[in-house]
């Protein structure tokens, strides 16, 4: 029996029907979990991501996958092809190992001139696989909002994407493994050999990634910091304080990648069916929030029933996709008029920015990337799903529905902290104009325009909000 299984199964037997969960708020812990679990793998690694960057953390994890394969682990790597430019040579090398297989979701035929693909095959290539999972030996899995890259793990000099994953053991791991297999064998996925020329006959022990990937000072500093983290010590010696709760996986039908999924099978519909009608409160944290007319109507129906709704999303200054902000900005006044609380994450913070990671709601220079919400302080969703039309209708998504007051209280606590420390609260003045209120200072500071943005950026967003492109956002 693999050592991970021998450590996990006795714990699970003490909590029948429940899953052991550890929320990965801190970016360093999120990287450490993936890196160390890859080192601990003995039989299988099933890895599925929307983005895998060719940067320090991406290369370290590529190296960890190759090292696992050299130990005899079967590695299956499933990537969305929209974000693989520049990775073809690395993927070829990995796929040439007999125990590594790489597959691509909705691959591009034109490798060098990818925009041509959108001209000739738009309806297919506009549908992407946004799922994110990392499953080890069939007994431990990580699911959440993070892709693979320095911006998600606080590993480089880029601004941090503040995010949330959850590490899970228990029955839901088998569900994630089965879901991975559904995607692995679906019609939208192609083996790398069908997309690229992959060399054959390589000796497994001769396949090497560049040594320079591990020899620079920044990489050494980051790995030392990881090794000294309390999380790593708890992970290795099996003393992580797990939250035990009933957990359900929700994942889109892979046929969504072909535009053939039934509407009732789409993740948001199933999500709201499972979570039922809130009676008291919903706290939503979403990097991209484009509610649409139908979504706004649904939110307002809940408000009229006495449900308190609070939403935290990126400000225009913090949003890494400014045009998406247009699909949200057009609905702000209506939501505020009906009593929905809106908070927008600041792009910077007053305190020091020295590698200080505040988890879900960010640190200095952070952009919100988490996708989570809690209902009535009892139920939580953590996953890849953004509250926008693209996640609803075009991209495939996944996530966990968790029945845990402990986890819901954690989300609520972080939300409340962000309201005062990391975000502007939006309010309407007596003339119905939006004000941005900074409550971090001793005295409230009221701003009359989109904070920390230029005139031309505001004009661009205003123009984008007029265009009929909401369904693409």
Swiss-Prot record:
Source organism per UniProt: Escherichia coli (strain K12)
PANTHER family: CARDIOLIPIN SYNTHASE, CARDIOLIPIN SYNTHASE C
Function: Catalyzes the synthesis of cardiolipin (CL) (diphosphatidylglycerol) from phosphatidylglycerol (PG) and phosphatidylethanolamine (PE).
EC number(s) stated in the UniProt entry for this protein: 2.7.8.-
Gene Ontology biological process terms from the UniProt entry: cardiolipin biosynthetic process
UniProt similarity note: Belongs to the phospholipase D family. Cardiolipin synthase subfamily. ClsC sub-subfamily.
One example GO MF annotation: phosphatidylglycerol-phosphatidylethanolamine phosphatidyltransferase activity
Family matches, as InterPro entries: Cardiolipin_synth_ClsC, PLD-like_dom, PLipase_D/transphosphatidylase
Residue ranges occupied by any PLD phosphodiesterase domain in the UniProt entry: 125-152, 364-391
Keywords, comma-separated and alphabetical: Lipid biosynthesis, Lipid metabolism, Phospholipid biosynthesis, Phospholipid metabolism, Repeat, Transferase
Enzyme class: transferase
Description of activity control: Full activity requires coexpression with the neighboring gene ymdB.
UniProt miscellaneous comment: All three cardiolipin synthases (ClsA, ClsB and ClsC) contribute to CL synthesis in stationary phase. Only ClsA contributes to synthesis during logarithmic growth phase.
Name of the featured protein: Cardiolipin synthase C
Xref: HAMAP family: Cardiolipin_synth_ClsC
Pfam families linked: PLDc_2
Mutant lacking the gene: phenotype: Triple deletion of clsA, clsB and clsC results in a complete lack of cardiolipin, regardless of growth phase or growth conditions.
Top-level taxonomy: Bacteria, Pseudomonadati, Pseudomonadota, Gammaproteobacteria, Enterobacterales
Location of the active site: 130, 132, 137, 369, 371, 376
Catalytic activity, as annotated: a 1,2-diacyl-sn-glycero-3-phospho-(1'-sn-glycerol) + a 1,2-diacyl-sn-glycero-3-phosphoethanolamine = a cardiolipin + ethanolamine
Disulphide linkage map: none
């Amino acid at each position: 029996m693999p050592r991970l299984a021998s450590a996990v199964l006795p714990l699970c037997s003490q909590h029948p029907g429940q899953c052991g969960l550890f929320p990965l708020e801190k970016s360093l812990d999120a990287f450490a979990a993936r890196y160390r679990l890859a080192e601990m793998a003995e039989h299988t690694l099933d890895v599925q991501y929307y983005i895998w960057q060719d940067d320090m953390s991406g290369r370290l994890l590529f190296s960890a996958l190759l090292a696992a394969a050299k130990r005899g682990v079967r590695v299956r790597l499933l990537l969305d092809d929209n974000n693989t430019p520049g990775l073809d040579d690395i993927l070829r090398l990995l796929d040439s190992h007999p125990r590594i297989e790489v597959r691509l979701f909705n691959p591009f035929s034109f490798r060098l001139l990818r925009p041509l693909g959108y001209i000739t095959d738009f309806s297919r290539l506009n549908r992407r696989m946004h799922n994110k999972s990392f499953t080890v030996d069939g007994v431990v899995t990580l699911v959440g909002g993070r892709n693979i890259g320095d911006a998600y793990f606080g590993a480089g000099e880029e601004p941090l994407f503040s995010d949330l994953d959850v590490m899970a053991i228990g029955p839901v791991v088998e569900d994630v493994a089965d879901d991975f297999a559904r995607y692995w064998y679906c019609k939208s996925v192609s083996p790398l050999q069908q997309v690229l020329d992959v060399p054959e006959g390589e000796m497994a022990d001769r396949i090497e990634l560049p040594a320079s990937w591990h020899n620079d000072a920044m990489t050494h500093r980051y790995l030392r910091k990881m090794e000294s983290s309390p999380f790593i010590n708890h992970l290795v010696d099996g003393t992580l304080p797990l939250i035990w709760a009933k957990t359900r996986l929700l994942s889109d039908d892979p046929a969504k990648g072909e535009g053939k999924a039934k509407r009732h099978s789409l993740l948001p519909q199933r999500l709201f069916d499972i979570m039922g009608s809130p009676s008291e409160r919903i706290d939503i944290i979403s990097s991209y929030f484009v509610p649409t007319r139908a979504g706004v109507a649904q939110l307002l129906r809940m408000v009229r029933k006495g449900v308190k709704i609070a939403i935290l999303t990126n400000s225009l200054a913090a949003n890494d996709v400014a045009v998406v902000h247009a699909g949200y900005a057009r609905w702000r006044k209506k939501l505020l008029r009906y009593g929905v609380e809106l908070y927008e994450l600041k792009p910077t913070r007053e305190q020091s920015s020295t590698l200080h990671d505040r988890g879900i709601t960010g640190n200095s220079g952070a952009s919100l990337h988490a996708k989570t919400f809690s209902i009535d302080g009892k139920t939580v969703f953590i996953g890849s799903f953004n509250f926008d039309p693209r996640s609803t209708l075009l991209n495939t998504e996944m996530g966990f529905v968790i029945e845990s007051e402990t986890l819901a209280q954690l989300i609520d606590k972080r939300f409340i902290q962000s309201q005062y420390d990391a975000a502007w609260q939006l309010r309407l003045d007596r003339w119905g104009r939006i004000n941005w209120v900074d409550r971090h200072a001793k005295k409230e500071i009221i701003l009359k325009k989109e904070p920390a943005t230029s005139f031309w950026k505001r004009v661009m967003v205003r123009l984008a909000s007029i265009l009929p492109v909401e369904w693409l956002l």
